[in-house]
Every structure is written in C-alpha cells, then in structure tokens.
Amino acid sequence: MGDISAATKAPAPPTPATPETNTTSSSSDTDVQHEPQIPSAASRNLVIFALGLAILVGVLDATIVATLVPTIADDFHSVDSSAWYGSAYLLVTGATQPIFGKIYSTFQSKLVFLSSVAILEVGSLVCALAKNSPTFIGGRAIAGLGAAGVISGGLIITALTTPLKQRPVYTAILGSLEGVGVIIGPIIGGQIASSIGWRWCFWINLPIGAVLCAILVFCLHPPKQTPEREQEQAGKTWTQKLAQLDLEGGLAIAGSITCLLLALEWGGTSYPWSDGRIIVLLVVFGVSLICVAVHQHWKGEAATFPTRLLKNRTFSMFLLCGLCFAGAQFTVLYYLPMWFQAVQGVSAAESGTRLLAMVVSVIVVSVIAGGSAGAVGYLPPFVFFATIFSSIGAGMLYTLHPSISKSKWIGYQILFGAGSGTGIQQAIVGVQVAVDHDDMAYATSAVMLVNTLAGSIFIAVSQTLFLGEMKRVTELIPNLDRHTLLSNFRSIRDKLDHQELDIAVNAYNRGITKAFLIGLVLCSITVLTWPLIRWIPLKKTEDPVKSERRNDPETLNAGNVA
C-alpha cells in the first residue's frame, strides 16, 4: 500500500522539457477558456441532470434488448434476423462518432444535441410501433444514430459549460451513468417485458426525452465559440456549413468502422475467422483505413478529424489510456456474468446482481477521483491510481476458480472497478484538457470512438481464447454439442455426470480467466503513458494549453510546438 500511496500522491514535476506538437497555429494572450453561462447553480444542476438522463437513455437503449431478443423474434416470427436487434444500434452508434465530432465543432452544440435526442426518440417510436423485423431493425439503426450524438454530445456540452477544475467530477458522474446503463439495461428490459410488454421498453423513452429536452431548452446556455471560430463561421449559410462537414470523409470513416465491427461481431460465432466473408471484411477495413487516413491528412482542417491532433503527445497518450481501460472493462463486464452463470451455476438475474460490487465501485471511486483531480489540479496522479488498481484487480480476477469465496470475488471487483472506472473518466477529461477549446468536440468524439472500438476488439480477442477452451470440452465430452455448451450451459448442468461437469466447469473457468488476463495486459500497458502525459494544470480559468505554451521558453522558441 505504501507504493500505491506514493504513486497517487507524487508531487507535480515541472513542465517537461520535451515539447509537444502544437494543436493550433497561433496563440494570443487574450485567449481564455469560455466560462459557463448557466445563470445559477440550480440551472446547472438541472442541465447536468438532463444530460445524464439523456446519456443513460442512450446506453439503456443499447443494452435493454439483450433479454428481449427471444420475445421480439417470436412476435415477428423472424429468428434469423434477431442478431441485428442489438447490432444495428451499436454499429451505427460506433460508426458515426467521428461525424458527430465534426458536426458539434461546426454547429451550435445545443441545437445538435436536441436534434440528436429527437432522432433517438424517433427511432424508439419506430421500434415501439414496428409490425415486422425489418422495421424494428430500421428503428434500432435510427435510434443508434441519435445515441451517437447524445452520448458524445453530453460530454462535449459538459466540458463547455463547467469550469475546468470541476470538469473531472461532472464527467465522472456522466460516465458512471454509462456503466449503470450497461448493467441494469438487461434487467430492466426483462422486467418491463414480463409485466407490461416489450414495446413499453421503447414507449417509455418518449416522455423521458420530452422532459429532458424541456429542461435543456430553457436552462442550457452553452458558451459561444472562440472569437477566431466565430469570425471564421460569420456570414456562412447553412448550405456552406453543411459543405464543411466533409461528408465523403465521414461516410468513408463510418464504412471502414462498420467493416471492422461486422467482422468482430461475426468472427468466431456466426462464421469461423477463416471464412471468406470475415477475411473480405477485414481486408476492406484495412485498405479503407489507409485511404481514409491519407484523405483526412490531405483535407487538413476541413477533415472530419484533424490528424494534427495525433501529434499532440498528451492527447495521444490519453487516447491510449482510454483504449486500454475501456477494453479491459468491457471484457470483464462481458465475461464476469458468464463466469457466475457457468462456473457458479447462478441465474442471469443473479449474475447481474453480483456485478453490483463493480458498478458501485466504478460510480463512487470515479466521482471521488474526479473531485480530487479538480482539487489537486492535475490528472496524472489519478492515471497512476487507475493503472495500479485496475492491474491488481484484473490480476486477482485471473485467479478466480470454482470454489473461490464470495468475499474474494467481491473484493476483486471493487479493485478493478475503482481502477478502470477512474481510468476511463480521466482519459475523457484528459483529451479535452490536452487540446484547445475549438478542438474539444473532435477530442471527445475521438475518445468515445476509441472506447467503443476497444470493447468490440478485445471482446473478440478474448472470445478466440475462450472458444479454444470450449473446443477441448466438446472433444472430451462428445455428447455435449458446441452450441448448447455456449448458449445454454446452465440448463444442462444437471444432465452431466460429476466427472463431465468438472471438465466443463473447469474449461469454462480457464477460458473466462484468459479473458481477464487480456484485461491485465491492457491495464498494465497504461504504465507506459506515465512519463509521456504532460502535467497540465486544471485550476486556471485561462486555456491551460495556451497558457503552458506561452510560459514554456522552449515552446516559444519552437514556434509551432507545445
């Protein structure tokens, strides 16, 4: 514990001598962070409440269908297309994140956010009224588009409307709601479907959306753009602003991401990784990614994502932190309920309840760390904390076995949740602090995209290791087919003799703990970012990036570096 304390309480070192690449071409002594224009604390709290509610609705909409799929597929008599009930939403949400970064940087954030909520509500309405599977899938895709704007927009607006030193705690609160939505979505969906019908899972979004829109219309007054950006946009018509969106680049990025997500969704489950369809998707993704990168670099400031931001060392390191912490957390959240059900033989509902230790840890520690970061004035100490605690927690989860005590798996969850939850929130705030005010939307959408892709990528990697163990089980127990083993193992536990059950349970345990090993590796990688993250102060009302740039002699001598 002494080492942990030393790591989290280390004094802030002087500004590193090695400069970072500047994210802007000029700076002025008059450039300041735009202070919130919310007139009162009550109004601000209402706005944060509405933004949090919107994010929660967006995340719940993604996870609530997990327990509804069999019921909806039965109603529509369309089992073959049921996999798209969840995938359509997630694919569109992930693929359109970069586009919304460009939209938020071009148009007024309040208008874009309210429009995103409206799109999400339209998608929910289509799902609630759907008479067949294609209509329902279309509604899910529409809702996913709205959710992309809502989830990233909530964090962007929070960054624009809260003082810099208070931003970590507000971001932690909103980010914690995402974790809550992931856990409680399937539980709420099952309860609503069994009591009043699955369509009410979507009807209920409409009054919630109306309430939060009313709050934001009257209480949200986000700051205007910087004078430079206002001058740049002055006199431009809507048509000219739409032309700025780099639609061809945005669509190319969305297409490339869609190919990757489809390959990860289908690979190893619907089709083997060696299947031609999976190979084609991965090849198209790789080629299109190279083409998109060249196109975005060539477009410069007109691109969907300005590639110059990647030259900012602190921004890139916080992106890496987001990738690692989110990848680890998604992997654990995906496989830990499976461990409870398959290895310990509990129900799906009970496995969700057993995750509460991690959920509470993520919420409580993330909020405390966010408030502490604002008080301390620097983010790096909390990245150290996140790396240490998440690595220890993931390492402990790797030691899970069928006869482990309840106190241990609860304690391991608390450690991992505290570290990974803090790490994800610090990454979100970190990318925002590392860039100038006008680049905040790009930075936020980038880290949200990275978080989304991390979950898909590392769950797929873990699944490959897991399926390898399952293959050995079917070889040892010939009468146990692979499909039943993977989809309905709990229901057949009583049909296996003692020896067969031991073989199957231990194989499940080995396969799932290998997934936790992936989480351990990811969390440990973040230690490499420690010496590379710049100690940017959070307590200044002035733009910290520009302030550091002016006060660093080497920066001034370098001209275009910070």
Curated annotation (Swiss-Prot):
Q: Which Pfam families match?
A: MFS_1
Highest taxon above the source species = Eukaryota
What are the record keywords, sorted? Glycoprotein, Membrane, Transmembrane, Transmembrane helix
Q: Which PROSITE patterns match?
A: MFS
Q: Low complexity composition bias: which ranges?
A: 1-10, 18-30
Task: State the conditions that upregulate or repress this gene.
Answer: Expression is positively regulated by the apicidin F cluster-specific transcription factor apf2 that binds to the eight-base-pair motif 5'-TGACGTGA-3' called the 'Api-box' that is found in all promoters of the apicidin F cluster except in the promoter region of apf2 itself.
**Record's function text:** Efflux pump; part of the gene cluster that mediates the biosynthesis of the cyclic tetrapeptide apicidin F (APF).
Tell me its family: Belongs to the major facilitator superfamily. TCR/Tet family.
Write down what this protein is called: Efflux pump apf11
